[in-house]
C-alpha cells in the first residue's frame, strides 16, 4: 500500500519537465540519498566483513587448538614407540629393510635357567665364586685352640697366595651343587641307569663349560646300587633300571684346571633306609669335624667308626648295626690326581700320618648292613691311567692309538667305556686290556658287599687352608 501512494504523489513530475529550481533540488536530494545509500552500504559492508573476520578468527583459533592437540598426541605416540623399540631388538623399517638405531639397555647379571645350562663362569663374571663352609680347626691334643690362624697376618698372606687355586675348587664345587640339585628334581624309579648318568653328565659338562683338560668331568658318574658300594657305572647295552626299593650312591666329580671336587650322596625312595642314610651322613660330618692340620689320619678313622656303629637300622623286620666298610676310605686329592697318596680310614687302626697345611681331602664314609668289607664284582667300567707310569714301549698300533686318545682326552683322570664310545672309539676292548696288562692303565671294577646287604655313602671335599678349613662342596642339601 505505502508504495502505491508514493508513486501517485510523484506522478506529475514523472511525465512532464521539472522547473530548474526543482531540478536542482531533485539533483541535490538524489545526490544526498545516493551518498547516504553508499554510507549505509559501507556500514553494512564493514559489519559483514567484521562478522566474517570474527567468524574466521574463531575458526582459526579452534583450528590452532586442534593442531596443537594433534601434535601433542603425535609426540606421545612417538615417545611410546621409541620406548617399545628400546625394549625390542629393532624391526626392519618397511620395504627399505633399514634397522632403526636402538639404545642398548644395560643387562643385569645372568641367572641360571631351568634346566640348568648357563656355565658357572658366566653366572659369576667377576671370577669370584661362592665359598664353601668355613670352619675353625679343631683344638690340638694339648688343648690349644687354632683360632689364632684366622687372625695371623702370615697365614692370611699364605692363604691369599693360593686364592687362585681355592677359586678353581669353588667354581667346580658350585657346578657340582647345581647339578646335584637338578638331578634330585627328576631322578625316579623306572629310569635306566644309562639314562640317569647321561642326563647328569650332559648337565655337568654345560655348567663346568667342558674344555679339554682345562675343565670337565673328573671321573665317571658312579651310581652303585644296593650291596654295590662304589665304582659302578653302566657300560653300553646295560639295561639296569632304577627300582623303588633300590639304594643308589650318586658319586660324580668336576674339575677346573685339575682341581677336583669329589662329592657323593645317596638316593632312596623307600623311607625304610632313612636311618642308614642318617648314620652315614653323621659319620661323614664327624670325619670333616675331626679333620685338620696336624691331625693324625688314624684319629679321624676312629671317630668315624664310633659314630657309625652307634646306629642301628631296621629293614624289612631285621635289625642291623650299621658297619663302616673297612676297606674303603677317604683320600688326599692332587692336581689331576683323584687319589694323591694319603688315605683317610673310616675305622680305627689306620696310619698315624698327619694331615698338612694346604692339602685337599675327600672325606667319605660308607655304611653297610652286610659284612662291612667289599670285593671286586661284576663287569669293569672305570679305568684310570697310572699317574706314576713312565715310558712303556707299545708295539700294537690299536693300543698306541687308544693310549693317545686317553692322553688327549683324560690324561690321568678316570674314564669309563661310555666315554670312549662317545669319542667315536670302537673295538677297543683288546687294546684297553693290553694297556691294563702293561700297567699303563689301571682297572677299577665295582666294589660290592655280600648280596642282600645295603650300602650308603656321603662324601665332601675339604680344603686345609692356612687360615681355616673349608668344606668347599657343602650345600643346602648335605
From Swiss-Prot:
CDD domains membership: MetAP2 (cd01088)
Feature: compositional bias, Acidic residues: 80-92
Keyword Protease attached: yes
Binding site for substrate: 231, 339
PANTHER family: METHIONINE AMINOPEPTIDASE 2
Compositional bias ranges of the Basic residues kind: 36-46, 97-109
Swiss-Prot/TrEMBL cofactor(s): Co(2+); Zn(2+); Mn(2+); Fe(2+)
Region (Disordered), start-end ranges: 1-122
Gene3D superfamilies: Creatinase/methionine aminopeptidase superfamily (3.90.230.10), Winged helix-like DNA-binding domain superfamily/Winged helix DNA-binding domain (1.10.10.10)
Textual note on the cofactor: Binds 2 divalent metal cations per subunit. Has a high-affinity and a low affinity metal-binding site. The true nature of the physiological cofactor is under debate. The enzyme is active with cobalt, zinc, manganese or divalent iron ions. Most likely, methionine aminopeptidases function as mononuclear Fe(2+)-metalloproteases under physiological conditions, and the catalytically relevant metal-binding site has been assigned to the histidine-containing high-affinity site.
Record-listed Phosphoserine modification sites: 60
GO MF assignments: aminopeptidase activity; initiator methionyl aminopeptidase activity; metal ion binding; metalloaminopeptidase activity; metalloexopeptidase activity
Domain of life: Eukaryota
Subunit organization: Binds EIF2S1 at low magnesium concentrations. Interacts strongly with the eIF-2 gamma-subunit EIF2S3.
Main location: cytoplasm
UniProt name for this protein: Methionine aminopeptidase 2
PROSITE patterns xrefs: MAP_2
Gene Ontology biological process terms in this record: protein processing; regulation of translational initiation
Annotated source species: Mus musculus (Mouse)
Catalytic activity, reaction form: Release of N-terminal amino acids, preferentially methionine, from peptides and arylamides
PTM comment text: Contains approximately 12 O-linked N-acetylglucosamine (GlcNAc) residues. O-glycosylation is required for EIF2S1 binding.
Keyword Metal-binding part of the UniProt annotation: yes
Family statement: Belongs to the peptidase M24A family. Methionine aminopeptidase eukaryotic type 2 subfamily.
Positions of a divalent metal cation 2 binding: 262, 331, 364, 459
Annotated Pfam families: Peptidase_M24
Residues given in the record as a divalent metal cation 1 binding sites: 251, 262, 459
Glycosylated position list: 60
Amino acid at each position: 500500500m505505502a508504495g502505491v501512494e508514493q508513486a501517485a504523489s510523484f506522478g506529475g513530475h514523472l511525465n512532464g519537465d521539472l522547473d530548474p529550481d526543482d531540478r536542482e533540488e531533485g539533483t541535490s536530494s538524489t545526490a544526498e540519498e545516493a551518498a547516504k545509500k553508499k554510507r549505509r552500504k559501507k556500514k553494512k559492508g564493514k559489519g559483514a566483513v567484521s562478522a566474517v573476520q570474527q567468524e574466521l578468527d574463531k575458526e582459526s583459533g579452534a583450528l590452532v587448538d586442534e593442531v596443537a592437540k594433534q601434535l601433542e598426541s603425535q609426540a606421545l605416540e612417538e615417545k611410546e614407540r621409541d620406548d617399545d623399540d628400546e625394549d625390542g631388538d629393532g624391526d626392519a623399517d618397511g620395504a627399505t629393510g633399514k634397522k632403526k638405531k636402538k639404545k642398548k639397555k644395560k643387562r643385569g647379571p645372568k641367572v641360571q635357567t631351568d634346566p640348568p645350562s648357563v656355565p658357572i663362569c658366566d653366572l659369576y663374571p667377576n671370577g669370584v665364586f661362592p665359598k664353601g663352609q668355613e670352619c675353625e680347626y679343631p683344638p690340638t691334643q694339648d688343648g690349644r685352640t687354632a683360632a689364632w690362624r684366622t687372625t695371623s697376618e702370615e697365614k692370611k698372606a699364605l692363604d691369599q697366595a693360593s686364592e687362585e687355586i681355592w677359586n678353581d675348587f669353588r667354581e667346580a664345587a658350585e657346578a657340582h651343587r647345581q647339578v646335584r640339585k637338578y638331578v634330585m628334581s627328576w631322578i625316579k624309579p623306572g629310569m635306566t641307569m644309562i639314562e640317569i648318568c647321561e642326563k647328569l653328565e650332559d648337565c655337568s659338562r654345560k655348567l663346568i663349560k667342558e674344555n679339554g683338560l682345562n675343565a670337565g668331568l673328573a671321573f665317571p658318574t658312579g651310581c652303585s646300587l644296593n650291596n654295590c658300594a662304589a665304582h659302578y657305572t653302566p657300560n653300553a647295552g646295560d639295561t639296569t633300571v632304577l627300582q623303588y626299593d633300590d639304594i643308589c650312591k650318586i658319586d660324580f666329580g668336576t674339575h677346573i684346571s685339575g682341581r677336583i671336587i669329589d662329592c657323593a650322596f645317596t638316593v632312596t625312595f623307600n623311607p625304610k633306609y632313612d636311618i642308614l642314610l642318617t648314620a652315614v651322613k653323621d659319620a661323614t660330618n664327624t670325619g670333616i669335624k675331626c679333620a685338620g692340620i696336624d691331625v693324625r689320619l688314624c684319629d679321624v678313622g676312629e671317630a668315624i667308626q664310633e659314630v657309625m656303629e652307634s646306629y642301628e637300622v631296621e629293614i624289612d623286620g631285621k635289625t642291623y648295626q650299621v658297619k663302616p666298610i673297612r676297606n674303603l676310605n677317604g683320600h688326599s686329592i692332587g692336581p689331576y690326581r683323584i687319589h694323591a697318596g694319603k688315605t683317610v680310614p673310616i675305622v680305627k687302626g689306620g696310619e698315624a700320618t698327619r694331615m698338612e697345611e694346604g692339602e685337599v681331602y675327600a672325606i667319605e664314609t660308607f655304611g653297610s648292613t652286610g659284612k662291612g668289607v667289599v670285593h671286586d664284582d661284576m663287569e669293569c667300567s672305570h679305568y684310570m691311567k697310572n699317574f706314576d707310569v713312565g715310558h712303556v714301549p707299545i708295539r700294537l698300533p690299536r693300543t698306541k692309538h687308544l693310549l693317545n686318545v686317553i692322553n688327549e682326552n683324560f690324561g690321568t683322570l678316570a674314564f669309563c667305556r661310555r666315554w670312549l664310545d662317545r669319542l667315536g672309539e670302537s673295538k677297543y676292548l683288546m687294546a684297553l686290556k693290553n694297556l691294563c696288562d702293561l700297567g699303563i692303565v689301571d682297572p677299577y671294577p665295582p666294589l660290592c658287599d655280600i648280596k642282600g646287604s645295603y650300602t650308603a655313602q656321603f662324601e665332601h671335599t675339604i680344603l686345609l687352608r692356612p687360615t681355616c678349613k673349608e668344606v668347599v662342596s657343602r650345600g643346602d642339601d648335605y
